Amino acid sequence: METLSRLLVFMSLFSGLVSGFALQNLPITSFEESYTQLFGDKNLFVHQDGKSVRLTLDERTGSGFVSNDYYLHGFFSASIKLPSDYTAGVVVAFYMSNGDMYEKNHDEIDFEFLGNIREKEWRVQTNIYGNGSTHSGREERYNLWFDPTEDFHQYSILWSDSHIIFFVDNVPIREVKRTAEMGGHFPSKPMSLYTTIWDGSKWATNGGKYGVNYKYAPYIARFSDLVLHGCPVDPIEQFPRCDEGAAEDMRAAQEITPSQRSKMDVFRRRLMTYSYCYDRARYNVALSECVVNPAEAQRLRVYDPVRFGGIPRRHRNGKHRSKRSRVDGTESI
């Protein structure tokens, strides 16, 4: 418990850092001016200030909303408080997509929050793909250094033409740099911002072992501090209407600083539980954008030597420490 507290303090000391510009200076948009309800009827509720939204999943339906504009690059953020108690099978998603415009070759940049059985933590999954390349998954999964059901925490996506960075409470947790070999697999078409809650019983918790139990419904996810800071664009003409301030921010946010990278490395070494870059059972050769970090690779090999080390399952020793002990972030820093 002491080492977990130390990790919490360590991460919070640097939570004010955002690549290239100060997040606290970005304007917060109201629901009425920037978003439209996607589905869910009365399961979406906008609070009186117009700047906080409640999404509900019950026996009837989930719910969600989408930005009015498409964007070609930008910084997108929301403070989110996740449902508590038994949440197995529940998926809360905060993501960019253009699936409504490009049904067969759409792009996505995803934050997905995967519920769990009682007394087990929510897990966070990030993913990207372009041109409908869902067969080439680029997923990563993580635990968090806090309980996301107790209070609001900030989740952010920075998307430029050269890279994508995911943030949790302003701490960078993942960077994807565009490579020539990626081709159309890097998201490059205008996208809208989506926020949803829905029933993912078939896959979200332990591969579908545990589904949504509506005895615990309604499941309520709360959102505030919604930020859309980017270049709105006509999805057909793809000509951006980008103000100079947003354009300057994108130019300034091209690289993670050495200090930020150090904090990202701490997060990934302690709290990452899956990365496609190290999944030898899935990809014999890592994809072109993967930068192999020896510390990350070693930790994941210890966690699952079959998946991350390429060791045949019949060679595994039957006695191992529990998976939880390896992924809960309580190791010494």
Swiss-Prot record:
Family matches, as InterPro entries: Beta-glucanase/XTH, ConA-like_dom_sf, GH16, XET_C, XTH
Residue numbers binding xyloglucan: 112, 125-127, 135-139, 202-203, 207, 282
Deletion consequences: In xth27-1 and xth27-2, short-shaped tracheary elements in tertiary veins, reduced number of tertiary veins in the first leaf, and yellow lesion-mimic spots in mature rosette leaves.
Tissue/organ expression: Expressed in 7 day old seedlings, roots, hypocotyls, rosette leaves, internodes between nodes bearing axillary shoots, nodes bearing flowers, flower buds, anthers and siliques.
Keyword annotations: Apoplast, Cell wall, Cell wall biogenesis/degradation, Disulfide bond, Glycoprotein, Glycosidase, Hydrolase, Secreted, Signal, Transferase
Active site per the UniProt annotation: 108, 112
Enzyme class: transferase
Compartments where found: Secreted, Cell wall; Secreted, Extracellular space, Apoplast
Positions glycosylated per UniProt: 131
Signal peptide start and end residues: 1-20
Physiological role: Catalyzes xyloglucan endohydrolysis (XEH) and/or endotransglycosylation (XET). Cleaves and religates xyloglucan polymers, an essential constituent of the primary cell wall, and thereby participates in cell wall construction of growing tissues. Required for cell wall modification during the development of tracheary elements.
Protein name: Probable xyloglucan endotransglucosylase/hydrolase protein 27
Species of origin: Arabidopsis thaliana (Mouse-ear cress)
Source lineage: Eukaryota, Viridiplantae, Streptophyta, Embryophyta, Tracheophyta
